[in-house]
Amino acid sequence: MTKSFTKYHGLGNDFILIDNRHQLQPILTPEQAIELCDRNFGIGADGVIFALPGVKQTDYTMRIFNSDGSEPEMCGNGIRCLAKFIAELENNNKTKYNIHTGAGIIVPELQGDGQVTVDMGQPRLLASEIPTTLANADDKVVDQLLEVGGKSWFVTCVSMGNPHCITFVEDVTAIDLAKIGPKFEHNPVFPERTNTEFIQVISPKYVKMRVWERGAGATLACGTGACASVVAGVLTQNNERLVTVELPGGCLEIEWSTIDQKIYMTGPAEKVFTGIIA
């Protein structure tokens, strides 16, 4: 049976989008996702995203398989791509969707300029919510020392429905992601592994970020990581609440609202091509 797909990217973080509206389970297996994500022998992508029927009064359900076959709770760049994909499938004037994810209900909204703004919900700061065994007396991890790769790093941990470990550095270009990234990801203090963000503060309103994603490795962008990093920057007094985050693939605008304490992410999602899986 052939299956159609559409490839999208959000700042170079690329995904294979599958119309899965006819059933509640993904029509592809994690093993098939690994094959499709292979950049030499497959389509090439950081993950496969499925648009499934909504549950609990939501419009849609989002499932995603990473390029290694693992399933994350959510993906910030991916949900912007999913919103654009859904809008194309429905072909109507609707611009806002309630999407059920493993991280809870996420609400993306298409903007008139082609950008997508996503209500990412409130960040979670308790060590048990991340999860991590690294915690201060208040059960939070803020600017705490962690030994990784024979070096001491000051880290702050934030969950955006998926785990993030953020560390501030003088120069993000000096970080050997391929070497240090896996050591953070698989550190035993993170029982479910972790995404890791390395942040260079240019000003209180502008930071540079490189990321090692759990299950995907070094990517050009990570939406949830950008959100978590701004939260970490506020907690450590490194940046303000409205920040431009520069990633290798481009920039995201992140706001941690003082009104509802939610994180709002704004960025692009671009269609690349469509095709058929034989």
Swiss-Prot record:
InterPro entries named in the record: DAP_epimerase_AS, DAP_epimerase_DapF
UniProt-annotated catalytic positions: C75 (proton donor), C222 (proton acceptor)
Subcellular location: Cytoplasm
Catalytic activity from the UniProt record: (2S,6S)-2,6-diaminopimelate = meso-2,6-diaminopimelate
GO biological process: lysine biosynthetic process via diaminopimelate
Biological role stated in the UniProt entry: Catalyzes the stereoinversion of LL-2,6-diaminopimelate (L,L-DAP) to meso-diaminopimelate (meso-DAP), a precursor of L-lysine and an essential component of the bacterial peptidoglycan.
Similarity remark: Belongs to the diaminopimelate epimerase family.
Complex and partners: Homodimer.
PANTHER family from the UniProt entry: DIAMINOPIMELATE EPIMERASE, DIAMINOPIMELATE EPIMERASE, CHLOROPLASTIC
Protein name: Diaminopimelate epimerase
Organism: Trichodesmium erythraeum (strain IMS101)
Recorded name of the encoding gene: dapF
